[in-house]
């Protein structure tokens, strides 16, 4: 859910341009590989919202949007664990999002309703109206649980890091995540109705994270040039 539809498209274009610029102009490193992937994903989510509002395939694009943002926590955690340099079977991180993505694709009535209002795109999914509340619980636990784990690992890496520039990079990533996603977590718990709408955070998060990515990639590029 985001301001529609021109803001969604403009945000998507901005993110595609920034992600491409990072790939082209910044030296290759784990951080500068992660940022483009993540920003392209955020940009595609904004694109799905634009398509939802401007085509006759609203249900399809609503599903694509759900699938897109469902993979974000797994990508976050994948990145954080890679930073720790621990051995880990990364494929296991994607079991839950793959399951719910397949569910969304195969279930014809997965999207209950979708609409574009003056300011927002509102999508209501069967996942949160299911007669099996366990599915909603698993999805919510995965989503916010992985984000919490990401923050935990990143904070741990930050505390161990001696390089001042790298510490700044980790702090920027951590702050962008904390500021934008924890309000959604609180609203998700305090206001149950918000569970239909919490992806709206990605409109604000996309812009903020893109700015954070530019700064962090610039700093990381300075480190890579010194090597």
Which residues does each predicted region cover?
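Juxtamembrane membrane-water interface segments of multi-pass membrane proteins
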Residues: 22-27, 81-90, 152-171, 218-226
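Interfacial "cap-and-anchor" motif at the non-cytosolic start of specific transmembrane alpha-helices
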Residues: 2-5, 21, 166-227
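Juxtamembrane membrane-water interface segments that cap and precede transmembrane helices
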Residues: 117-135
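Compositionally biased, low-structure terminal segments
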Residues: 89, 111, 120-121, 129, ...
């Amino acid at each position: 859910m985001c301001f529609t539809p021109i803001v969604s498209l403009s945000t998507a274009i901005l993110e595609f341009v920034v992600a491409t610029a990072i790939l082209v102009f910044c030296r290759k490193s784990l951080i500068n590989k992660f940022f483009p992937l993540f920003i392209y994903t955020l940009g595609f989510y904004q694109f799905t919202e634009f398509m939802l509002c401007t085509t006759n395939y609203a249900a399809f694009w609503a599903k694509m949007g759900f699938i897109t943002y469902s993979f974000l926590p797994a990508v976050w955690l994948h990145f954080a664990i890679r930073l720790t340099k621990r051995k880990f079977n990364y494929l296991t991180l994607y079991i839950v999002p793959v399951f719910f993505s397949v569910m969304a694709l195969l279930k014809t009535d997965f999207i209950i309703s979708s609409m574009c209002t003056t300011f927002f795109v509102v999508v209501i999914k069967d996942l949160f109206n299911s007669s099996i509340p366990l599915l909603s619980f698993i999805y919510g636990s995965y989503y916010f649980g992985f984000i919490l784990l990401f923050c935990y690992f990143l904070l741990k890496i930050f505390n161990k890091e001696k390089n001042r520039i790298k510490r700044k990079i980790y702090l920027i990533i951590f702050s962008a995540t904390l500021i934008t996603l924890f309000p959604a977590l609180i609203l998700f718990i305090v206001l149950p109705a918000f569970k239909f709408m919490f992806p709206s955070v990605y409109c604000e998060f996309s812009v903020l994270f893109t700015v954070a990515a530019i700064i962090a990639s610039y700093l990381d590029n300075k480190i890579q040039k010194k090597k």
